[in-house]
Amino acid sequence: MLLWVLALLFLCAFLWNYKGQLKIADIADKYIFITGCDSGFGNLAARTFDRKGFRVIAACLTESGSEALKAKTSERLHTVLLDVTNPENVKETAQWVKSHVGEKGLWGLINNAGVLGVLAPTDWLTVDDYREPIEVNLFGLINVTLNMLPLVKKARGRVINVSSIGGRLAFGGGGYTPSKYAVEGFNDSLRRDMKAFGVHVSCIEPGLFKTGLADPIKTTEKKLAIWKHLSPDIKQQYGEGYIEKSLHRLKSSTSSVNLDLSLVVECMDHALTSLFPKTRYTAGKDAKTFWIPLSHMPAALQDFLLLKEKVELANPQAV
């Protein structure tokens, strides 16, 4: 009996793996639109999919980012300047894409643009500190999706939303984690709404990667700037040594980040080209072995493990 059970499990695993390897045909006539292509995941994705033969439309925030990308890619690739937080810019870009792709529609929309914003204890922050990551990571993503969706429906294509392990587990104060939690919710509702139209919607949850988003120098500068303007009461509660110790912890954590950005692009590739794309992808050793498993554990255990890494406050009773 045990042998039959093992054989059945092996067969299921084999069929699941085989199904995941089945690919679409004729990618040469398929258009894909990628946001956040100045650097990081988006830049590598644009170059990778251009080499594979897709007709890539890469959205960059800056002229310099656009020119640098064009210098490394073929004439098939087109760049557009796009600020995802600017509704008129998004609308105009969608109109240009519509005229460019014609009746073929848009096979792939990869929502990759994102910012980290301020990462600091919640009681250090104002509501304005939350705005930028929520405007870019959430409202920008939603607005781009809504404007491009008719083109994706026409092609019965794919929508790929780049979230984060920060959308599964909160690891710091600021707008980044709330924005990514909301992206996960938007992704799930969009996936169910689009199923009847033959549109596949996938979510990618990278761990910590070495990109401009997680630049320890910029993160440190933002944290120091906030510390300097905190009230004496807050500084007394946290202690003068807190900021130095927390910055040391930050540098230690960023020294062990994933270096291979292609792990995320491979997830994008599977979501774009597989006949049976996954609903969720996890990228990075830390995400697979620590963050995602931890997200399924009881909240008390999550708190215990994460608070072990927190810097102790000097005088929390001084309230």
Swiss-Prot record:
Which EC number applies?
1.1.1.209, 1.1.1.53, 1.1.1.105
Transmembrane region(s): none
One Pfam match, given by its short name, reads adh_short
Its keywords, alphabetically, are:
Endoplasmic reticulum, Lipid metabolism, Membrane, Microsome, NAD, NADP, Oxidoreductase, Signal, Steroid metabolism
The free-text tissue note of the record is: Highly expressed in epithelium of estrus uterus.
Q: Which residues are listed for NAD(+) binding in this entry?
A: 34-58, 83, 180
Q: Where does substrate bind?
A: 164
Gene Ontology CC: one annotated term: intracellular membrane-bounded organelle
Q: How does it assemble?
A: Homotetramer.
Q: Report the protein name in the record.
A: Dehydrogenase/reductase SDR family member 9
Please give the organism. Rattus norvegicus
